[in-house]
Amino acid sequence: MATISAVQVEFLEFPAVVTSPASGKTYFLGGAGERGLTIEGKFIKFTGIGVYLEDKAVPSLAAKWKGKTSEELVHTLHFYRDIISGPFEKLIRGSKILPLAGAEYSKKVMENCVAHMKSVGTYGDAEAAAIEKFAEAFKNVNFAPGASVFYRQSPDGILGLSFSEDATIPEKEAAVIENKAVSAAVLETMIGEHAVSPDLKRSLASRLPAVLSHGIIV
């Protein structure tokens, strides 16, 4: 059995296992990493992102990816796409390293999501309406350092949003968006072809081989 460990990103700790009071489910940490931008030649870290997976992700991903090395997985887009589209629930935590207005944060997320959906032909009126609902959820949110947004993604295309002043998962979700393309696009922009966090991709690729080969013990 592989032991799941916590991951530290700057001052943010991503525990090995979390239970969501909103869904009642327990998730293990697939990986975590930083997201930043190079501004005037200096890399500034803005956010730590952790991707948590439901335990049924292990047999689902192992069917195709068991036995692959970290080096093989990190360069394989289909591996990440199988995490994104897999028939298991995901819980993504995005915690701020620097303060950020919710509207500013969501604007960039939405731009990336819309660009991806347009590129793959999944953006239509329903997706535009879902993106509007996404924007509305963040309108009055301001993230202090350590504050978090949680994205709960169910296999049937439901995206649950919740906000916390720390790493605590709220009991109630602030918004629920029922749109599979938008839900998938959120994670795609983080770990897909044009990922905002290569660090997160590396973390998933380094941690999951042992889990897929040996199962998990937490």
Curated annotation (Swiss-Prot):
Induction: In roots by B.japonicum. One of its GO terms (molecular function) is chalcone isomerase activity. It is an enzyme of class 5 (isomerase). Pathway: Secondary metabolite biosynthesis; flavonoid biosynthesis. It comes from the Eukaryota. GO terms for biological process: flavonoid biosynthetic process. Keywords: Flavonoid biosynthesis, Isomerase. The keyword 4Fe-4S does not apply. Catalyzes the intramolecular cyclization of bicyclic chalcones into tricyclic (S)-flavanones. Responsible for the isomerization of 4,2',4',6'-tetrahydroxychalcone (also termed chalcone) into naringenin. This is Chalcone--flavanone isomerase 1A. It comes from Glycine max (Soybean).
